UniProtKB/Swiss-Prot annotation:
UniProt GO molecular function: dITP diphosphatase activity; ITP diphosphatase activity; metal ion binding; nucleoside triphosphate diphosphatase activity; nucleotide binding; XTP diphosphatase activity
Main subcellular location: cytoplasm
GO cellular component, one term: cytoplasm
Single biological process term from Gene Ontology: nucleoside triphosphate catabolic process
Tagged with keyword Metal-binding: yes
Keyword Manganese belongs to the record: yes
Source species, domain of life: Eukaryota
Residues engaged in binding ITP: 10-15, 49, 65-66, 82, 141-144, 164, 169-170
Descriptive protein name: Inosine triphosphate pyrophosphatase
The protein's enzyme class: hydrolase
Cofactor: Mg(2+); Mn(2+)
Role according to the record: Pyrophosphatase that hydrolyzes non-canonical purine nucleotides such as inosine triphosphate (ITP), deoxyinosine triphosphate (dITP) or xanthosine 5'-triphosphate (XTP) to their respective monophosphate derivatives. The enzyme does not distinguish between the deoxy- and ribose forms. Probably excludes non-canonical purines from RNA and DNA precursor pools, thus preventing their incorporation into RNA and DNA and avoiding chromosomal lesions.
Length: 184
């Protein structure tokens, strides 16, 4: 039986590595399409990105939108984390919560998948609760050094990649995608 082929539309090498590791029984290829940066709720953003990606690729596509949501700030920065991180770095994200006693947060990953043009878009969401801490560990992947998932003493930046790829928001969303593929 041949592997299901998935065109993952991303320009982020670290996301691609994680998706390939989690979907190891699938043939994941990367398609780098310059997608618009949409604003809105995460599910809306993922669906819009998927519609735009399928127009460019003309075949099955998978897109992702990731959020980091601070409970003390009503869910901000949320889907705009990319821009906050670019300007503030992990240290600045931690400092944003300096005036709040609530350091809890959740990482959220929304994947949107379609078989092709005119086909329905399927959305898969995963969440990982945790807290924002002073940065520790590997700084190579975004906000990983300042997010410590509940039940762990390590940040994503300190954690073994295999452990992270079992518990993360991305892993949870991709588990739902795998279930969809098994049933369709």
């Amino acid at each position: 039986m041949s592997l299901r082929k998935i065109n993952f539309v991303t320009g982020n090498v670290k996301k691609l590595e994680e998706v390939k590791a989690i979907l190891k029984n699938f043939e994941v290829s990367n398609v780098d399409v310059d997608l618009d940066e949409f604003q809105g709720e995460p599910e809306f953003i993922a669906e819009r990105k998927c519609r735009e990606a399928v127009e460019a690729v003309k075949g099955p596509v998978l897109v992702e939108d990731t959020s980091l949501c601070f409970n003390a700030m009503g869910g901000l920065p949320g889907p705009y984390i990319k821009w906050f991180l670019k300007n503030l770095k992990p240290e600045g994200l931690h400092n944003m919560l300096a005036g709040f006693s609530d350091k809890t947060a959740y990482a959220q990953c929304i994947f949107a998948y379609t078989e092709g043009l005119g086909k329905p878009i399927h959305v898969f969401a995963g969440k990982c609760p945790g807290q924002i801490v002073a940065p520790r560990g590997d700084t190579a992947f975004g906000w990983d050094p300042c997010f410590q998932p509940d039940g762990f003493k390590e940040t994503f930046g300190e954690m073994d990649k295999d452990v992270k790829n079992e518990i993360s928001h991305r892993a949870k969303a991709l588990e739902l995608l795998k279930e969809y593929f098994q049933n369709n």
